[in-house]
Amino acid sequence: MTPVTFYTKNNCPQCKGTKMLLESKKIEYTERNIDENEGYRLEAQATGFFNVPIIVPSPDSGIKSWSGFKPDELKKLI
C-alpha cells in the first residue's frame, strides 16, 4: 500500500469523498489543509495543480500525482 500526501481545504465535497475513500481502503495518508496553513498552500501550488483534492503518492511508488476525486486512481494505491 502506498502512503500519500493529501491536500485539502475546508468545505470541499471532493475532498470529503476522497478522504472517505482513503479511510475505507485503509490507505495511509497525511492530510494538509491549505485553508489552515500557508505553507501547505504553497506546497500544493508547487505540485502544478490548481484544484483540490491533490493526491501526492510517495516518490518511490512510481505513481503520478493527480487532482480531483478519482476513485480509479485511488485503487492503484492499494
Q: Predicted regions: what is each one?
A:
Residues 33-50:
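Thioredoxin-like thiol-disulfide oxidoreductase module
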Residues 53-57:
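Cytosolic beta-strand hydrophobic patch enriched in CBS
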Residues 13, 38-39, 72:
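Short alpha-helical
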Residues 7-8, 29-37:
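A short glycine-rich beta-strand->turn/loop micro-motif centered on a GG-aromatic cluster
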Residues 17-32, 49-52, 65:
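Conserved segment of the thioredoxin-like fold in thiol-based oxidoreductases
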Residues 1-27:
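Local sequence-structure signature of Cys/Sec-based thiol-disulfide redox active-site neighborhoods
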Residues 58-78:
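Non-catalytic, surface beta->alpha helical segment in thiol-disulfide oxidoreductase systems
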